Swiss-Prot record:
UniProt binding sites for Mg(2+): D105, N227
Cofactor: Mg(2+)
Binding residue positions for acetyl-CoA: A380, N386, Y387, S405, A423, R440
GO molecular function term, any single one: glucosamine-1-phosphate N-acetyltransferase activity
Protein name, UniProt field: Bifunctional protein GlmU
EC number: 2.7.7.23, 2.3.1.157
Organism: Escherichia fergusonii (strain ATCC 35469 / DSM 13698 / CCUG 18766 / IAM 14443 / JCM 21226 / LMG 7866 / NBRC 102419 / NCTC 12128 / CDC 0568-73)
């Protein structure tokens, strides 16, 4: 169906008192992303010409957190209801566009449902998203005559008979810009709350003989709002369960779907295995036959085919070629790169460092601002001393180098191809190819030496 141009209004002015937080409610995160950002992303994916964000409490924090040139910021200085919020945005509506109204604390609304609502909107009428609940207490009821929607009655204003209605308003609707502005101008606050309800436009449209079409979401969770942290945590589990199900159906082996969190996007190959309590953040790519052990965190990284990441390893902004092994308890920080077949063992940290093909750093090592060649062995306790307190410097290690345990490489320094660094050496000057570098205090031995005894 050919749709009109459309703009989106997102209501995000609420304080969120029941969150007991200094952070605006809509900035609390679900799957690692602010709730309102989920809604903004949906609006952009729908192709919104403009996104009008109605804000009130915590406006400065919102503007700091949301970096989107497509956002038009609309202040609602006083929170006098949803109709009042829409009235603040109305001057920005074009007469010939559709206006879709969303909520910043309803984060799981799907693009598919919104597109169905958009397609269903009748010419000159309103598309309304509704659901049926076994217990509709507290929600606005949908009133009908002969099956046609005639209005919405808020729970506090409803009669006993109307409170028996199970079909409720989700608050999400779409209408033409010119119609919306006209109806908004007619709203009054003559109700129990003394507020301007956007829902009153349904009755106004009906009085004009306009058609109101109700559409239901695919899942109830799509229209569930968040008022407290308990509700947020429940929606988090709903979201994570849905993501885990998609991955399982796509061939990813999740050992326990209930103990897996996806906080971004995951691109994967075949026969990927992910153990329990793994967190995927940002944009992550896993190649074929990748295995990830329990308790790992992978963020904004590319993991090549046949890599194995052992338990409790953290990988952030890193790139691993094929057949690399990492961990357990390893940390790859931004700029870490492992070439094919490289190995990083337990308690090894890398940052802005490249480890060549077949090279190994097995234990208790820090490699920062380093370029390490192929088939290099980095002994336990090796440290690249890359920082002098003001500036950082690079360490370069050629192919086939053997670095003994407890070695310090004071950058800037270069170790030539095939060189050997003896255990316990502090390297302060360049080492030539195939040379042995050794710097130790000569060992002495004192016969009959006794340890000090505590004075009584």
């Amino acid at each position: 169906m050919l749709n009109n141009a459309m703009s989106v209004v997102i209501l995000a002015a609420g304080k969120g008192t029941r969150m007991y937080s200094d952070l605006p409610k809509v900035l609390h995160t679900l799957a690692g992303k602010a709730m309102v950002q989920h809604v903004i992303d949906a609006a952009n994916e729908l192709g919104a010409a403009h996104v009008h964000l109605v804000y009130g409490h915590g406006g400065d924090l919102l503007k700091q957190a949301l970096k989107d040139d497509n956002l038009n910021w609309v202040l609602q200085a006083e929170q006098l209801g949803t109709g009042h919020a829409m009235q603040q945005a109305a001057p920005f509506f074009a007469d010939d566009e559709d206006i879709l109204m969303l909520y910043g604390d309803v984060p799981l609304i799907s693009v598919e449902t919104l597109q169905r609502l958009r397609d269903a909107k009748p010419q000159g009428g309103i598309g309304l998203l509704t659901v049926k609940l076994d217990d509709p207490t507290g929600y606005g009821r949908i009133t009908r005559e002969n099956g046609k929607v005639t209005g919405i009655v808020e729970h506090k204003d409803a009669t006993d008979e109307q409170r028996q209605i199970q079909e409720i308003n989700t608050g999400i609707l779409i209408a033409n810009g010119a119609d919306m502005k006209r109806w908004l101008a007619k709203l009054t606050n003559n109700n129990a709350q003394g507020e301007y309800y956007i829902t009153d436009i349904i009755a106004l449209a009906y009085q004009e003989g306009r058609e109101i079409v109700a559409v239901h979401p695919q899942r109830l969770s799509e229209v569930e709002g968040v008022n407290n942290r308990l509700q947020l945590s429940r929606l988090e589990r709903v979201y994570q369960s849905e993501q885990a199900e998609k991955l399982l159906l796509a061939g990813v082996m999740l050992r326990d779907p209930a103990r897996f969190d996806l906080r971004g996007t995951l691109t994967h190959g075949r026969d990927v295995e992910i153990d329990t309590n793994v967190i995927i953040e940002g944009n992550v790519t896993l190649g074929h036959r990748v295995k990830i052990g329990t308790g790992c965190v992978i963020k904004n990284s590319v993991i090549g085919d046949d890599c194995e990441i052992s338990p409790y390893t953290v990988v952030e902004d890193a790139h691993l070629a094929a057949a690399c092994t990492i961990g357990p308890f390893a940390r790859l920080r931004p700029g870490a790169e492992l070439l094919e077949g490289a190995h990083v063992g337990n308690f090894v940290e890398m940052k802005k460092a490249r480890l060549g093909k077949g090279s190994k750093a097995g234990h208790l090592t820090y490699l920062g601002d380093a370029e390490i060649g192929d088939n290099v062995n980095i002994g336990a306790g090796t440290i690249t001393c890359n920082y002098d307190g003001a500036n950082k410097f690079k360490t370069i290690i050629g192919d086939d180098v053997f670095v003994g345990s407890d070695t310090q490489l004071v950058a800037p320094v270069t170790v030539g191809k095939g060189a050997t660094i003896a255990a316990g050496t502090t390297v302060t000057r360049n080492v030539g190819e195939n040379a042995l570098a050794i710097s130790r205090v000569p060992q002495t031995q004192k016969e009959g030496w006794r340890r000090p005894v505590k004075k009584k």
